[in-house]
From Swiss-Prot:
Record's protein name: Nucleoid-associated protein GK0018
Regions of compositional bias (Low complexity) in chain numbering: 9-18
SUPFAM superfamilies: YbaB-like (SSF82607)
DNA-binding keyword on record: yes
One Gene Ontology cellular component: cytosol
Localization: Cytoplasm, Nucleoid
Function of the molecule: Binds to DNA and alters its conformation. May be involved in regulation of gene expression, nucleoid organization and DNA protection.
Pfam families: YbaB_DNA_bd (PF02575)
Family note: Belongs to the YbaB/EbfC family.
Region listing for Disordered, in residue ranges: 1-32
Subunit architecture: Homodimer.
HAMAP family registered for this protein in UniProt: DNA_YbaB_EbfC (MF_00274)
Length: 108
């Protein structure tokens, strides 16, 4: 009975190591993937990667009004929040396969 138990433990350990490598690969892929958040009908675009790092902010010239800086700030904020939401969704999609069936709040 002990021998069967040890064999199962080794098998489980190998499965965990495989899953850990797959998770690490998925994390690396997340860093490479990008998402775009937009606001103002595409007047402001924010690009982020799957790790929620902002990589680029694009602002169309026609939206820049020195007399209405507040509107531009609002558009940048909205586009940034949109990009971060999409980055979260991407991470959940990619990493969710590893946590499927586990009920750990806030993991992914």
């Amino acid at each position: 009975m002990m021998r069967g138990g040890m064999g199962n433990m080794q098998k489980m350990l190998k499965q965990m190591q495989k899953m850990q490598k797959e998770m690490q690969k998925a994390q690396e892929e997340l860093a490479e993937k990008t998402v775009e958040g937009t606001a103002g009908g595409g007047m402001v675009t924010v690009v982020a990667n799957g790790h929620k790092q902002i990589l680029e902010v694009k602002i169309k010239e026609e939206v820049v009004d020195p007399d209405d800086i507040e509107m531009l700030q609002d558009l940048i904020l909205a586009a940034t929040n949109d990009a971060l939401k999409k980055a979260d969704e991407l991470a959940n999609e990619m990493m969710g396969q590893f946590t499927k069936g586990l009920n750990i709040p806030g993991l992914f």
